[in-house]
Amino acid sequence: IRTKRNRVHAEINALKKQGKDIKQVLKDAKKLPGELKKVEEKRIALANEIGEILLTIPNMMHKSVPKGKDDTENVVREKIGKPKKFSFDVKSHGELAEELDIVDFDASAAVAGNGFYYLKGDLVLLNQALQQYGLNFMIQKGYIPVEPPLMINKRATQGVVDFETFRDMIYKIEEEDLYLIATSEHPLISMFVDKILEENQLPIKFVGISPCFRKEVGSHGLDERGLYRTHQFNKIEMIVICKPEESYDYYDELLGLSKELFKSLGLPSRVYESCSGDLGDLKAKGADLEAWSPRKKDYFEVCSCSNLTEAQSRRLNIRVRKGGEKYYPHTLNNTAIATSRAMVAILENFQNKDGSVDIPKVLQPFMGKKKIEKR
């Protein structure tokens, strides 16, 4: 239609020069803008539809991912540290925290509903100590600290997650194209949307610190009054943007740093690799670090490490220039420490018979004490 429009304009000019009648040609020309608008609207609609379909295509898994139907077939790869044997009946973290008067779940439920909490006294200090220790730990390992925005738009959100699957987990701001972040990974990766990086800028290694917000809630029962699965929590998150041939080396590095961090806290843990049936659509490979719960006599997730290869960089149009060519970099993410879950592990693993809780040695300088006791 644009070609026809150009041709008609040329024809009108030619007819004018020849002194001929241009009424019919003008009549035809006036129809063209409307026709062009209709076709352009159809083109945009089809492009959007194609884009939505492309977003549903999953990533290719790495050949080393164990095969399995769901999380019951995930594989234990390694255990770090031995669980402590207690000479008394251990309490859940929620019981301990309430008895020590360092948390108030009833007050938070009254003002915000279930899945929130008021931290008090030494638990506030422990929460802050974990964030500062985790941040310092990763800075010393070469990661640059970043404090990101706590809200991002739909384009950014779609670029980092399977939006249709993730939609029910995230909070949307009414009448705004903004969503509260579920992890700082999302704004850290989308920070580079539509950008072309030079290869000598790689690797990009960030450690983000932020509150996080999710709609997910915990299971019913005693541990629902707790810190394990909540709507709001603080997290130290790591991301890497790197050359494709280096991404699995960084995957090992990220997972290794989480193991080292939790070992330094004195918490028994294990590496639990996701099988094919439990791996998210965008992940090529992933594993959780799980801490030991003496109350449940089982491990629970505290960290998650993933290699998403090109999935996010393609969706966000992040490219790297090498000479005269461009390619999509690989992206990875890893939980350095989600403080609420780390506090669950510390309260349960370091509890004493008298109801007090020992503070891990590496955190004592941040808290100025060795033990949490009832005031």
State each model region's role.
Residues I1-K84, I102:
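N-terminal alpha-helical targeting/anchoring segments
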